[in-house]
Regions:
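Short amphipathic alpha-helical interaction segments
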Residues: 82-98, 179-204
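Short alpha-helical segments that sit at the start of domains
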Residues: 24-60, 121-165
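Interaction-mediating elements
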Residues: 15-18, 29, 161, 173, ...
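Accessory beta->alpha helical hairpin/"wing" motif in late/C-terminal subdomains of nucleic-acid enzymes
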Residues: 103-144, 200-251
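Short, amphipathic alpha-helical interface elements at domain boundaries
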Residues: 1-91, 117
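Short acidic, hydrophobic short linear motifs in intrinsically disordered regions
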Residues: 47-80, 147-181, 205-206
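Short N-terminal secondary-structure initiator segments
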Residues: 2-9, 92-111
Length: 252
């Protein structure tokens, strides 16, 4: 992952200008994402989920149940996996703690509301979504493959700039990402972007029973993909303040 050195206040101000024109459309999509994270927090707080004494992580049974709530689910049949095996849970956990939304109680047994819990809950939905998105794009410490996630994001953004994809249409997955997905069975960045409602990954028809290395993937671009590209561009490229329309996309 790249070092996110741009002042977050400046990034937020620029993004709010970009968001202004399409706020209503993006808000509906972002609400779904924030709902998953809200369920994550509420589950830990209301059920007083016991944390591991050594790592402070969520236990296997709780992870298994949490997994069933989210948009992107891991296909595990029994509660035998650790928190690190659930990319979405691992991300939500890191985000909640690093942003002071949740914190461990003094004894380290449970989660309790953090110093920023109320501020987060009172923020507008797009502000909350942008915070989640910034961690996926520019931090990556929660990921088991943060170096690969950074490369995959670069490949994806370069592809978007050349392809100029349209929302709600499907495209072949960029080759660099497709090769990694076929060889390893997963690309965590794609998992995070799916959970954030940015895109949807699907196997091409008739390929379900092929060997992983032989499979071909396609992705459906969602409306929030445009917001991702604009945020990425704001941070990584020189941004001309007079050009407020950075969109690469066509909306019919």
């Amino acid at each position: 992952m790249v070092d996110f050195c741009l002042n977050q206040v400046q990034a937020k101000e620029k993004m709010m200008k970009i968001i202004k024109g399409r706020k209503e459309n993006w808000e509906k999509e972002a609400e779904k994402v924030c709902h998953d994270f809200d369920m994550f927090c509420e589950y830990l707080l209301e059920k007083k989920v016991k944390l591991s004494k050594g790592s402070g992580n969520i236990g296997k049974k709780a992870c298994f149940e949490l997994n069933s709530f989210f948009t992107v689910k891991e296909d595990f049949e029994k509660p035998t996996r650790l928190q690190k095996d659930y990319p979405v849970i691992n991300f939500f956990y890191f985000f909640a703690v690093s942003k002071g939304i949740l914190e461990q109680d003094p004894k380290g047994n449970y989660m309790q509301p953090g110093c920023n819990y109320r501020c987060y809950k009172e923020a507008e939905v797009l502000e909350r979504f942008l915070l989640l998105l910034m961690d996926v794009l520019f931090d990556g410490r929660f990921s088991n493959d943060s170096a690969w996630s950074g490369l995959s994001m670069e490949y994806l953004m370069n592809w978007a700039e050349k392809k100029r994809p349209c929302a709600n249409k499907s495209y072949a997955l960029p080759e660099n990402i497709s090769v990694r997905l076929c060889m390893t069975g997963r690309d965590n960045l794609m998992t995070y972007l799916e959970e954030l409602g940015v895109l949807t990954l699907r196997l091409k028809e008739g390929q379900k029973y092929l060997l992983p290395i032989e499979r071909q993937w396609k992705m459906e671009i969602k409306p929030l993909f445009e917001l991702v590209c604009n945020l990425y561009s704001t941070v990584h490229k020189e941004y001309d303040e007079e050009k407020e329309d950075l969109a690469f996309f066509c909306f019919d």
